[in-house]
Design a protein with these regions (language model features):
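Small/polar, glycine/serine/threonine/aspartate-rich low-complexity segments that form flexible
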Residues: 103-114, 147, 160-195
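Periplasmic alpha-helical coiled-coil/stalk elements that build and connect Gram-negative outer-membrane
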Residues: 7-124, 238, 242, 284
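Amphipathic alpha-helical coiled-coil segments
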Residues: 4, 8-27, 81, 134-149, ...
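Amphipathic alpha-helical coiled-coil scaffold segments and their short linker/junction regions
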Residues: 92-162
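Transmembrane beta-barrel architecture of outer-membrane proteins
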Residues: 14, 59, 156, 186-188
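Outer-membrane beta-barrel pore domains and translocons
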Residues: 63, 152, 162-166, 194-196, ...
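Outer-membrane beta-barrel proteins
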Residues: 54, 168-172, 202
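Membrane-embedded beta-strand positions in outer-membrane beta-barrel channels/transporters
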Residues: 16, 122, 158, 190-192, ...
Length: 314
C-alpha cells in the first residue's frame, strides 16, 4: 500500500510542477510579447521617418500576433493540466464532473533541493524503500509458512475436560425403591495424542516447497535490492546532471536578456538590422525554453530520488 501511495504522490507532484512549468512558459511568452511590441513600435517609427520598410513593420506585427495566439493556447493548456491534476487527486467516475475547481493559482517558481547527497539517499535505504519493504514482507511470510507446515509433522497432544451435573425431581414415586430427588455431578478429564504417521510424505513435500519458496523470495529480495541500488545511482547521476544544466541555463538567460536589450537599443539607433534583432529575440525564446525545462527536469530528478528512498511519505 505504501508503495502505491508513494507512486501516486510522485505523480501528483510531477503533474503539479508541469503546471508550474507551463505557467513559467506563459510568463516568458508575456515577456516576449512586450519585446515584440517594442519592435512593432520601433519598426513603425522607422517606417514613418523613412529609415525602415513596410515588410519589417508587417513582420513585427505578425510575430506579435503569433505570441498573442501562443498565450491563448498556453492558458488553455494550463486549465487542461489543472483538470488532470484534479483527477489524480480526486478520481471521479466517467460521466461525472470533478468537484474540485480549476481556477486556482499555482506557484510560479519550482523549489529545488540542491543539497541532496548520495550517502543521504543510501542511508537506511533498505528500511525506508517501499519496494524493498514489499520484498522483505514476502520473505517473512514465506518463513512463517515454513514454520506452519513443519508444525504438521509433530505429534499433537490435546487436553480434554468436562464437568457433568444432573438433577432429577420426581413429584410422584413410581418406584418405591427410587428416591424422589436424584442429583449427579462429576468432573472428567483426559489427554489424547495424535501422531502424523500416514501424512508424513505429504508434509515432507510441503516442507520442501516452503523451503524452495523461501529461497525464491530471498533471490527476489536480493535482486530488488541490487536493482534499487542501481536505480538510485542512475537517478542521482541524473539529478547532478540536471543541476549542472540548470546552473548553465540560469547563466545563459542573463546573457540572452542582455543581448536583446543591447540589440533593441542599437536597432533604435539604426546600427542593427531587423534580422539581427529577430535573431536576438529568438535566442531569448530558446534560452527561456531551456531554462524552464532545466528547472522542471531538476525537480523531477529530485522527486525520483525521494520516491526511491520512500521519503515522499513519512
Amino acid at each position: 500500500v505504501k508503495n502505491q501511495v508513494v507512486n501516486t504522490i510522485a505523480e501528483v507532484i510531477n503533474t503539479y510542477y508541469i503546471i508550474v512549468r507551463q505557467k513559467q512558459q506563459l510568463k516568458a511568452i508575456e515577456e516576449q510579447m512586450q519585446i515584440n511590441q517594442t519592435r512593432v513600435d520601433l519598426s513603425k517609427r522607422r517606417l514613418e521617418i523613412g529609415m525602415g520598410s513596410r515588410p519589417e513593420y508587417l513582420q513585427s506585427q505578425i510575430d506579435l500576433n503569433a505570441q498573442v495566439s501562443a498565450k491563448l493556447h498556453q492558458e488553455t493548456y494550463i486549465r487542461e493540466l489543472k483538470a488532470i491534476l484534479n483527477q489524480r487527486i480526486n478520481p471521479t467516475p466517467a460521466g461525472q464532473d470533478n468537484p474540485l475547481p480549476i481556477d486556482y493559482e499555482v506557484s510560479d517558481t519550482i523549489p529545488i533541493d540542491f543539497e541532496i547527497t548520495l550517502d543521504a539517499i543510501r542511508n537506511n535505504l533498505e528500511e525506508s524503500s517501499p519496494s524493498l519493504q514489499i520484498s522483505r514482507k514476502n520473505l517473512e511470510i514465506a518463513g512463517l509458512s515454513l514454520k506452519e507446515v513443519k508444525a504438521d509433522q509433530y505429534p499433537v497432544v490435546q487436553f480434554n475436560s468436562a464437568y457433568n451435573f444432573s438433577l432429577t425431581n420426581n413429584d410422584v414415586a413410581l418406584n418405591p425403591f427410587l428416591p424422589l430427588i436424584n442429583q449427579n455431578s462429576g468432573f472428567n478429564y483426559g489427554f489424547s495424542a495424535a501422531i502424523p504417521i500416514l501424512n508424513y510424505r505429504n508434509t515432507h513435500r510441503l516442507i520442501k516447497q516452503a523451503e524452495l519458496n523461501i529461497g525464491y523470495q530471498n533471490i527476489l529480495y536480493n535482486s530488488e535490492r541490487s536493482a534499487l541500488n542501481l536505480r538510485v545511482v542512475n537517478a542521482y547521476n541524473t539529478y547532478e546532471l540536471q543541476k549542472e544544466a540548470l546552473a548553465l541555463e540560469e547563466s545563459n538567460i542573463l546573457l540572452a536578456k542582455e543581448n536583446v536589450t543591447i540589440t533593441l537599443e542599437t536597432y533604435r539607433l539604426g546600427s542593427t538590422t531587423f534580422i539581427q534583432l529577430r535573431e536576438a529575440e529568438k535566442s531569448l525564446e530558446d534560452a527561456y525554453d531551456r531554462l524552464i525545462a532545466a528547472r522542471y527536469n531538476a525537480k523531477v530528478a529530485e522527486t525520483e530520488l525521494l520516491r526511491l528512498k520512500g521519503g515522499l511519505v513519512k
